[in-house]
């Protein structure tokens, strides 16, 4: 299949369309504005719906409603905009409504800046809206990987009835890369496969079988039963949907943990360190929830590994999960920046060299 040079944000939008998304609700915010811009042109071409909402709060609640009919729905925003969506995201999770949410992370906290960041890891993986819920959360490291993950995102969302979150730093959205676009999925809502969906009532239907999309349970026992069902589903996701990349880990003296674009920079550092005679590996979570604890532990706790370096474009958020995975078996160091200052290859090389010298 031929390669096409595409900007990340536009490629992500096109992949969603090819995966069957026919409803986009969003609001412009840098650095993801090209996603709604692209959708505004493409959705009418394929008979879909593009709606620029009056706010992020309105957009996520439109997602809630449209996804409740069984349609494949998507919204996108960036850090402070995603913060505004958190109430609606919790509603979608509580009602078990499948949808795809894109967060093109930018610098923070507050309004921060419009450059790339990985500062929303806690929000996407640990926090967000209220209640005990999770989102299946992907952290792509390239435009092609974002496309490939999008092509499975709706299938996963519908299998488990869980919203899917993409944590894509601003560089992924703004860079251009040659990509291979998949064929268009012929998706139609099948009420037999989605008995929970509100697909409308017609004369002759059994009123007792009406669809109700709901996240409120006034009765305590009913809420407890619902939460037990959610937790059972999350355990199934943890058991089946962990994704990661292990790179050059066999025989490594040091292991780097990183996600997203930072992991690509780490690979450049690994190549330079190899020229200096130092064997360094990389473990990159592709799903940051569920986090691949066992895979990280296996790579980092090899007998020959002297220490682990976690590198992030924040002040050390995934670091907590890395430490939980390793559980004190190896020393874990951290290197990172916030304020959208991307860690460089030279900085990572220098950090590994200082660790080797015992500094």
What function would you assign to each model-found segment?
Residues 266-299:
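Generic long, charged, amphipathic alpha-helical segments
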Residues 1-127, 134, 142, 338, ...:
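Thiamine diphosphate
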